[in-house]
């Protein structure tokens, strides 16, 4: 069942003061103004200047005007969001944003002790994320889509609008005569997410009017299953050791080996192996029956190799 913006904010219970990630677009404008109405004097706006568009300075000026009118302190961080070779532009921008949020929280911590940050992704964004994951053949982590709450670098992140349709946010703003800016990149059909939004979501709306709620329910089921797999991986790691030791690892079934290795790589190194890389690694582990068997396989941005009785991951670019 979809939720209205007022109801979503009523149920939202963060620690105060609260920072809202504010781009100037409709979604973050609605979240910022609704939170500022509920907690006057307790809300701050974090704006990240990516420098990727000529209009970035205009975005910042717009945010300054809105925050001044709403009496919300605005904190701006300029970042270099250009992507490195082999890195997607979206991933580079995302990483830069989170680093900026962490820096802004540190900059303001002496004054306001901000520990909670709210992001404005809504129900349509959640559907788009799930469809993108399906198109890539993602496993449970991808099918879980976006979490409503998580902790990163000591900060509590929240997505209180995941049950609210995007159209509801714009209608709420129009009722108040509140303005926002349109990011030109949102209309760029070169991006798959934009094509999903413009072409696929209207078809889903016509065929399955409740698709936002049902897709969200599927993502929640996937998130629960993912949590169980993480618990199993932790139990197996406690027996196999960190870094993983080959002999006890080989005693596990192939699916449990894969689950353990995915969790170890992601939790320890933020490395995500491809399906092909993981399959090759599992084949090598199965074939490793002698002390002299050598393993060295490209995995994510680094390599896994056998050292003695265990497996080790390293990134040559980061090694001294």
Positions of PLM-derived features:
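Core alpha/beta nucleotide-donor-binding catalytic domains of modification enzymes
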Residues: 1-198
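AMP-forming adenylation/ATP pyrophosphatase catalytic core
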Residues: 2-26, 39-44, 48-50, 79-83, ...
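Electropositive, surface-exposed helix/loop patches at the edges of structured domains
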Residues: 108-124, 214-233
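Mid-to-C-terminal catalytic subdomains of enzymes
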Residues: 170-220, 224-227, 306-309, 315
């Amino acid at each position: 069942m979809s939720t209205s913006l007022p109801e979503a904010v009523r149920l939202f219970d963060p620690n105060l003061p609260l920072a809202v990630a504010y781009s100037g677009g409709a979604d973050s404008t609605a979240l910022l103004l609704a939170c500022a109405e509920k907690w006057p004097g307790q809300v701050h706006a974090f704006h990240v200047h990516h420098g990727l568009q000529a209009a970035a300075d205009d975005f910042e000026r717009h945010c300054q005007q809105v925050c001044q009118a709403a009496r919300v302190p605005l904190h701006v961080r300029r970042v270099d969001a250009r992507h490195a070779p082999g890195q997607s532009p979206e991933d580079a921008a995302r990483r830069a944003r989170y680093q900026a949020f962490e820096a802004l929280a540190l900059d303001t911590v002496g004054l306001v002790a901000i520990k909670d940050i709210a992001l404005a992704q809504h129900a349509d964004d959640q559907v788009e994320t799930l469809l993108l994951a399906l198109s890539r053949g993602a496993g449970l982590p991808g099918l879980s889509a976006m979490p409503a709450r998580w902790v990163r670098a000591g900060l509590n992140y929240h997505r209180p609008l995941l049950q609210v349709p995007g159209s509801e946010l714009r209608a709420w703003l129009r009722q108040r005569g509140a303005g926002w800016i349109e990011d030109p990149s949102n209309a760029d059909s070169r991006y798959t997410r934009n094509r999903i939004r413009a072409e696929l979501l209207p078809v889903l709306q016509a065929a399955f009017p409740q698709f936002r709620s049902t897709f969200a329910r599927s993502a929640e089921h996937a998130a629960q299953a993912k949590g169980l797999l993480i618990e199993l991986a932790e139990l197996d790691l406690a027996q196999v050791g960190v870094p993983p030791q080959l002999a006890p690892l080989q005693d596990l079934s192939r699916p449990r080996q894969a689950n353990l290795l995915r969790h170890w790589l992601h939790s320890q190194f933020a490395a995500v192996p491809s399906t092909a890389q993981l399959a090759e690694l599992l084949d090598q582990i199965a074939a490793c029956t002698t002390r002299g068997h050598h393993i060295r396989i490209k995995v994510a941005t680094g390599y896994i190799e056998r050292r003695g009785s265990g497996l080790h991951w390293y990134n040559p670019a980061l090694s001294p």
